[in-house]
Amino acid sequence: AQIIVARSAIKTNDEAKAKEAYAKLQKIAKGELAAEALYYDAYFKNKEGKFEPSNVVVQKIAKDYSGYKYFGAKSLIVMAKNFYGLKDSFQATYILESVIENFKEYTDVIEEAQKELDFIKGEEAKRNSSITN
């Protein structure tokens, strides 16, 4: 039942309720549901500016739930956002390009990765054009 609460809260943009439901789910879930709960743990940590703890969760997904490619791919996008938040745009760009190249079967993931990549490249172009000699 917790997964239904969590997913409906995400769909209705009730992130506080979703965060709570996914935290409860994380304690009891196995397999793909555990990967999903961990993804949202990383997602919420990223939104709170907790970039390094978020990356630790993404690494756990990669290590323990590598068979669940969809949440693995989505969590890599969170990792890229974390690296951008940590001022490492090179690493962020590399991860996003890798997601776009390697997860073509997930069109929603590709679109999200491309959108994030375009944003980062746009921000970097602004930053670089403001540098004067």
Predicted regions: what they are:
Residues 1-133:
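Acidic, polar-rich low-complexity tracts and alpha-helical solenoid repeat scaffolds
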